[in-house]
Amino acid sequence: MPVSLTYLGIDPGLTATGWGVIGISGSRLTHIANGTITSNARLSLAERLVQIEAGLVQVIHEHAPDAAAVEQAFVARDASAALKLGQARAIALLVSARAGLAVAEYAPNHVKKSVVGAGHADKSQIRLMVEMLLPGAKAGSEHAADALALAICHAHSGSANERIAAALLRAGAGR
């Protein structure tokens, strides 16, 4: 019987952080849940980061993933926007690591190539392929679709030994 694992994909952003949880058993992928954590633009940066942190803690607590995949930052022309994205990414990395998850990072083009087959796929192509690979899945937002794509990419990238080791760790930890 194949080992079953759960992966969390996180598409970080200050305004909207997408998340998606998938299961993998052998080569079979299943959709578990997805959503978007939004922060209130009227709050201070620190308070908005706390909102993202609280949302991710809740997702991890509810779904108990075995590993997480976080999108790497792309180079933005707006330095201020790049810094804010970096801070949201730091929250995603910190929350995942603090929960004891193995955390992988993937460049956007790598995720697109892994899921769609083309490194420069657009958002509609990503959503379409995610919904094809995860029957019954309906991504609630572009951010959630991107997060599901990250989880799928991680499922495709992980070796069987990593999957087995993660499952054994999970079983030993009594999760």
UniProtKB/Swiss-Prot annotation:
InterPro entries: RNaseH-like_sf, RNaseH_sf, X-over_junc_endoDNase_RuvC. It catalyses: Endonucleolytic cleavage at a junction such as a reciprocal single-stranded crossover between two homologous DNA duplexes (Holliday junction). It comes from the Bacteria. GO terms for biological process: DNA recombination; DNA repair. Mg(2+) 1 binds at residues 11, 143. It is an enzyme of class 3 (hydrolase). Disulfide bonds: none annotated. CDD domains: RuvC. One of its GO terms (molecular function) is magnesium ion binding. Binds 2 Mg(2+) ion per subunit. Coiled coil: none annotated. Its cofactor is Mg(2+). Its main location: cytoplasm. Its EC number is 3.1.21.10. Pfam families: RuvC. Mg(2+) 2 binds at residue 71. The active site is at residues 11, 71, 143. One of its GO terms (cellular component) is Holliday junction resolvase complex. It is found in: Cytoplasm. Belongs to the RuvC family. Homodimer which binds Holliday junction (HJ) DNA. The HJ becomes 2-fold symmetrical on binding to RuvC with unstacked arms; it has a different conformation from HJ DNA in complex with RuvA. In the full resolvosome a probable DNA-RuvA(4)-RuvB(12)-RuvC(2) complex forms which resolves the HJ. The RuvA-RuvB-RuvC complex processes Holliday junction (HJ) DNA during genetic recombination and DNA repair. Endonuclease that resolves HJ intermediates. Cleaves cruciform DNA by making single-stranded nicks across the HJ at symmetrical positions within the homologous arms, yielding a 5'-phosphate and a 3'-hydroxyl group; requires a central core of homology in the junction. The consensus cleavage sequence is 5'-(A/T)TT(C/G)-3'. Cleavage occurs on the 3'-side of the TT dinucleotide at the point of strand exchange. This is Crossover junction endodeoxyribonuclease RuvC. It comes from Parvibaculum lavamentivorans (strain DS-1 / DSM 13023 / NCIMB 13966).
